[in-house]
């Protein structure tokens, strides 16, 4: 998914920079596993031969974690088993329906399985992502998070192959420190997860709304931006109601990698406004204060409503738009914005001005109104999900794109610009953090941003269960003890296209 981190060494046909295709940062060895025993053999072989070890599920990672020059990759994509338990008794006290998912089960497959059983499974927005890989291990936000919390909150039991080759079950009471670490502490840390058993909820009637407006749909630029600002003013009410919104904000050129500072062909697109357990009239009533403001500003927009007696049907009808993978034309950074940013008028205004500034400078926003706590359930306290998620009302991704033929210098400067720009949101949320799965490879103090107060214990457990550092991934727990000796012109200190070596003191 992120060829930039492999050194642009083997691009898809039509996007290659030269006529050659070299190994670059792609693993040298790949084991297409279908059994736990094969994973154990692979882990033991890599450890005994001192090979760099990589874990890959579907490869959906913005920062190149499924790659590594000269490494051995364990590919878990074929672990597709699914088992339904009508009544599952978990160590933590949960009693109810549950589903066991093999590590290779993708979101679409989990959703389809749940639909057949008339239950709801918490998965991600993108249907092709693996449920039991880095998505859930990094926390995992969902269109249903504002109601039920993070994907990691749903896990009742894990099966894991540890760095020493042992195959264990981890629950809140059995191997509880492994359970705690893996649920929020990220993937590629101390073991290979082979399956997860997760909660299954009743089917949930859901309404979904989409709409957009462009600069041409408003009387002037002031009205365009006032319309967006009024959305931010309603975040608290939307999240408190258990809804989720995914929006795009930027110029048409920004989506094509052709944006320039000062371009004013702006558009706002509500990709998905998800209202679980709400009818269309109830959703319309919730949106009315915002829509009244848009109408008073003479903004032209047409909301399209869809409703079904289960979440899956509306999401499959209009879910995350699929994007072209395998291209190195983007760089992103993100920030979780806590509730106080929206309660405080000054902070809310600074948030608005920051996002406007990003768009004015040729960047684009992929943002969410979302809660990582969940309005219908209490989040567990025995897992390592980034604490900032529990107080967040928004997850904001700021990104840039460039033409795929851009020079290394352009890529480098564009990347640093996004990292530096994110200071505007860091400053209004100094005690918050960023979602590791959609975060900046160059995030300053990634330990605090991605893991928060959990990091000291996470690092301690890393030394306990993987003292030799067999498992490594960019920005993962303990990765500061290692460095990649890069061989390509991109002067990142973090890059997969090079030999992995212990960091000199």
How should these model regions be labeled?
Residues 1-505:
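Soluble FAD-dependent oxygen oxidases
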């Amino acid at each position: 998914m992120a060829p930039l981190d492999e050194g642009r060494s083997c691009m898809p046909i039509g996007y290659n920079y030269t006529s050659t295709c070299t190994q670059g940062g792609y693993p040298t060895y790949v084991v297409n596993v279908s059994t736990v025993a094969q994973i154990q053999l692979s882990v033991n072989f890599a450890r005994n031969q001192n090979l760099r070890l990589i874990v890959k599920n579907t490869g959906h990672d913005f920062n190149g974690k499924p790659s590594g020059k000269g490494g051995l990759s364990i590919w878990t994509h074929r672990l597709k088993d699914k088992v339904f338990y009508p009544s599952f008794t978990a160590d933590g006290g949960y009693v109810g329906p549950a589903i066991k998912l093999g590590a290779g089960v993708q979101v679409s497959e989990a959703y389809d399985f749940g639909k057949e059983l008339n239950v709801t499974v918490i998965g991600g927005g993108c249907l092709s992502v693996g449920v039991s890989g880095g998505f859930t291990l990094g926390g995992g936000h969902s269109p249903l998070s504002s109601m039920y919390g993070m994907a990691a909150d749903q896990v009742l039991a894990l099966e894991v192959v540890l760095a020493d080759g042992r195959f264990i079950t981890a629950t809140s009471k059995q191997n509880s420190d492994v359970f705690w670490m893996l649920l929020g502490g990220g993937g590629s840390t101390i073991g290979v997860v082979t399956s997860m058993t997760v909660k299954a909820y009743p089917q949930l009637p859901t309404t979904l709304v989409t709409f957009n407006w462009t600069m041409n749909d408003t009387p002037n630029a002031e009205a365009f931006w006032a319309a967006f600002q009024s959305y931010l003013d309603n975040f608290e009410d939307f999240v408190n109601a258990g809804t989720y919104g995914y929006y795009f904000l930027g110029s048409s050129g920004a989506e094509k990698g052709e944006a320039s500072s000062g371009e004013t062909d702006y558009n706002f697109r509500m990709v998905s406004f998800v209202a679980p357990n709400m009818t269309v009239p109830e959703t319309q009533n919730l949106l009315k204060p915002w829509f009244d403001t848009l109408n008073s500003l003479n903004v032209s927009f047409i909301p399209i409503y869809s409703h079904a007696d289960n979440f899956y049907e509306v999401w499959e009808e209009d879910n995350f738009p699929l994007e072209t993978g395998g291209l190195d034309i983007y760089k992103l950074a993100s920030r979780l914005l806590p509730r106080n940013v929206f309660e405080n008028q000054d902070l809310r205004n600074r948030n608005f001005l920051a996002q406007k500034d990003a768009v004015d400078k040729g960047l684009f926003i992929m943002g969410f109104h979302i809660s990582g706590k969940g309005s219908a359930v209490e989040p567990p306290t025995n897992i390592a999900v980034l604490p900032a998620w529990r107080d967040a009302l928004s997850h904001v991704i700021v990104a840039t794109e460039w033409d795929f033929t851009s020079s290394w210098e352009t890529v480098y400067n564009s990347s640093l610009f996004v990292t530096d720009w994110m200071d505007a949101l860091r400053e209004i949320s100094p005690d918050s953090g960023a979602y590791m799965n959609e975060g900046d490879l160059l995030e300053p103090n990634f330990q605090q941003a991605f893991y928060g107060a959990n990091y000291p214990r996470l690092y301690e457990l890393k030394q306990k269960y993987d003292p030799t550092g067999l498992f490594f991934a960019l920005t993962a727990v303990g990765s500061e003890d290692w460095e990649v000796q890069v061989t390509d012109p991109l002067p990142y200190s973090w890059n997969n296209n090079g030999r992995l070596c212990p960091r000199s003191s």
